[in-house]
Amino acid sequence: MPITPQQALQRTIEHREIFHDEMVDLMRQIMRGEVSDAMVSAILTGLRVKKETIGEIAGAATVMREFSRRVEVTDRRHMVDIVGTGGDGSHTFNISTCAMFVAAAGGAKVAKHGNRSVSSKSGSADALEALGAVIELQPEQVAASLAQTGIGFMYAPVHHPAMKVVAPVRREMGVRTIFNILGPLTNPAGSPNILMGVFHPDLVGIQARVLQELGAERALVVWGRDGMDELSLGAGTLVGELRDGQVHEYEVHPEDFGIAMSASRNLKVADAAESRAMLLQVLDNVPGPALDIVALNAGAALYVAGVADSIADGIVRARQVLADGSARACLDAYVAFTQQATAQG
């Protein structure tokens, strides 16, 4: 028998787990709009208070994937998603979005799943729009973009229409729920590799093991000790690495890669326009902390995508494509593709 919403709520009140298959049943009911807003908010609160388990997160992610509009990709070699849970409150420029162009220029296929602002002054969708890109591409257009430019940006509302059911509840609650950690787990292109930033140290090991359960090939889940949901320049970064079916947890520091430490305040921006300006400076290879943090994160993406043999090798490759203009050319090609694709309908 499927678990009822009332039974699920009772479990959370008693700090007991909703098992994987039960979570699948429950999430299907929620995504179909069969559970009242009051009950959804109660369950989300209960899960948050008792802390979501690996099985609960994996079960919920399985259903979100099931309900998504997929991007059909035949060749997933060297494919990677560079994504963060957001919510770190750092208000930095769009580091992962900038790293996307560098990683693509370096030989990865970047299938980035994103949305509007959560923790930065502008989310990945906001940043791409500020750069002139059209973000609301249909799944077949994203697949074509990936094939032609090495980049496919999947705007979450286009690919997860069922999320409209819970949007009003999430908006009214105004606090983090399980849905904040599900987004990065539900890439519509099925990227087998992922560089994921998280907003809390506990999530490093949890999300790496959720990805393991969901069948990911390789992953780096990262949290900077200064609170950033990226590999950080301002402090050490906790890493949960999934490779060869095993999860290993360790810590890295910018000095390990010959990069000078720099406080995250040097990366802060006030709005999307400032974020755009800093991103373009990086892609134009202007030296400074912004360039360094993008090279670090793009290098990690190239490593997890299997293009580079190590993060250090990935950083070398990232700096090469920044210096020779390939990363900037990748941005220009992507923006042009999105504009042409939508103009053609």
UniProtKB/Swiss-Prot annotation:
Pfam families given in the database record: Glycos_trans_3N, Glycos_transf_3
Q: What class of enzyme is it?
A: transferase
This enzyme catalyses:
N-(5-phospho-beta-D-ribosyl)anthranilate + diphosphate = 5-phospho-alpha-D-ribose 1-diphosphate + anthranilate
The prosthetic group or cofactor this protein requires is:
Mg(2+)
Q: Where does anthranilate 1 bind?
A: 84, 115
One GO cellular component term noted in the UniProt record for this chain: cytosol
Keyword Disulfide bond belongs to the record: no
Report if keyword Nucleus is assigned.
Answer: no
Please tell me where Mg(2+) 2 binds in this chain.
229-230
Query: Which residues does the record give as 5-phospho-alpha-D-ribose 1-diphosphate binding sites?
Result: 84, 87-88, 92, 94-97, 112-120, 124
For this UniProt record, the keywords arranged alphabetically read as follows: Amino-acid biosynthesis, Aromatic amino acid biosynthesis, Glycosyltransferase, Magnesium, Metal-binding, Transferase, Tryptophan biosynthesis
Instruction: Identify the stretch annotated as signal peptide in this record.
Output: none
Give me the residues that bind Mg(2+) 1, please. Answer: 96, 230
Residues holding anthranilate 2: 170
Q: Which domain of life is it from?
A: Bacteria
Q: In which pathway does it act?
A: Amino-acid biosynthesis; L-tryptophan biosynthesis; L-tryptophan from chorismate: step 2/5
Q: What is its EC number?
A: 2.4.2.18
Question: Which PANTHER family does the UniProt entry name for this protein?
Answer: ANTHRANILATE PHOSPHORIBOSYLTRANSFERASE (PTHR43285:SF2)
What HAMAP family does UniProt report for this protein, alphabetically? TrpD
Quaternary structure and partners: Homodimer.
> What's the protein name?
Anthranilate phosphoribosyltransferase
- The record's gene field reads trpD
